[in-house]
Regions:
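Conserved RNA-binding domains used in RNP assembly and mRNA/RNA metabolism
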Residues: 1-81
Length: 81
């Protein structure tokens, strides 16, 4: 699965500080790009980097309930040097 680069638009929780009007609170729309390294019925997990042994670093788990759209990202692979 780690050969699939994706763009994910998703909604994150947001909080406010101090006193304010009730309608001042809003959600944050986030845009993330990474390698899809794991998925379940509840989450998608993307990573910034994939190692030679198919391990990964800097993983982000995004709840599917928060995801607005997922798009594949074309990646041009270069030959080994």
């Amino acid at each position: 699965m780690s050969d699939r680069a994706v763009y994910i638009e998703w909604v994150d929780s947001a909080s406010t500080r101090g006193w304010g009007e009730h309608d001042d609170a809003s959600l944050s729309v986030c845009h993330s790009v990474g390698w899809l390294v794991h998925k379940t019925k509840d989450i998608l997990v993307i990573s910034t980097s994939i190692g030679e042994n198919n391990d990964s670093i800097d993983r982000l788990a995004i709840p599917r309930a928060c995801i607005r759209k997922v798009r594949r990202v074309a990646v041009q692979k270069r030959g080994k040097r």
